[in-house]
């Protein structure tokens, strides 16, 4: 799944009632989604492994654990979040992504996880669980992904709204983070490049989420293998 930029938690109102019916209807359409508090789990995990940079959670799935980042994308392919051998690996962020703060997050934050079942068993480990989103009812009932990074305030606890769920072949460069793979020093992708990723994801999406996303946003991409093709 791909999700658009993290939602800000809405402030509480002053307790006054709306003056018009229109204001009441507009207020009822607003939805406040509060990120679960994952900071303590993250803090305890990071004390055991400094490569841990975040905590990822999706309601009603086994996706609820630490996310690591190394100097390359191969170190944790067969290691768990504690650095111990594991066939299913762990959730790991692309080495090019930035997690210094919420404000400095990459325009496209990419997190990988294995699907090691050749039959695409959605009850498997790690990102095998993402296959639950192939079920439209489940997908519609679970529109959010929660991702928390290390930080000193609540802004590090983020809610991301899903705008696309798709299968793709490798000709779609949806995991691009920098302008140029060969010259990462040129910086991250432009708004136009991000918009191309967004449009490509929406065109391939299994469902129409009707979520507005622009090239000025930041997105979170969860990526795994599938044996569908």
Label the predicted regions.
Residues 1-229:
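Solvent-exposed, non-transmembrane regions of membrane-associated and secreted proteins
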């Amino acid at each position: 799944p791909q999700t658009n930029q993290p939602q800000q938690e809405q402030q509480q109102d002053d307790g006054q009632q709306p003056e018009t019916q229109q204001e009441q209807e507009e207020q009822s359409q607003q939805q406040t989604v509060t990120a679960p508090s994952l900071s303590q789990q993250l803090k305890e995990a990071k004390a055991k492994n400094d490569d841990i940079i975040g905590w990822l959670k999706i309601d009603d799935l086994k996706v609820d654990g630490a996310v690591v980042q190394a100097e390359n994308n191969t170190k944790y392919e067969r290691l768990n979040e504690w650095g111990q051998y594991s066939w299913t690996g762990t959730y790991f962020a692309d080495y090019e992504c930035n997690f210094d703060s919420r404000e400095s997050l990459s325009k496209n934050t990419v997190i990988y996880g294995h699907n090691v079942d050749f039959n695409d068993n959605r009850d498997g480990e790690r990102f095998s669980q993402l296959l639950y989103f192939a079920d439209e009812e489940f997908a519609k009932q679970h529109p959010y992904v929660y991702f928390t990074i290390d930080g000193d305030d609540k802004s590090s606890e983020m809610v991301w709204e899903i705008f696309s769920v798709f299968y793709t072949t490798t000709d779609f460069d949806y995991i691009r983070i920098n302008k140029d793979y060969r010259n990462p020093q040129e910086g991250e992708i432009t708004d136009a490049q991000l918009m191309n990723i967004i449009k490509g994801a929406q065109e391939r999406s299994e469902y129409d989420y009707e979520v507005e996303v622009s090239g000025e946003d930041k997105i979170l991409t969860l990526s795994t293998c599938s044996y569908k093709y």
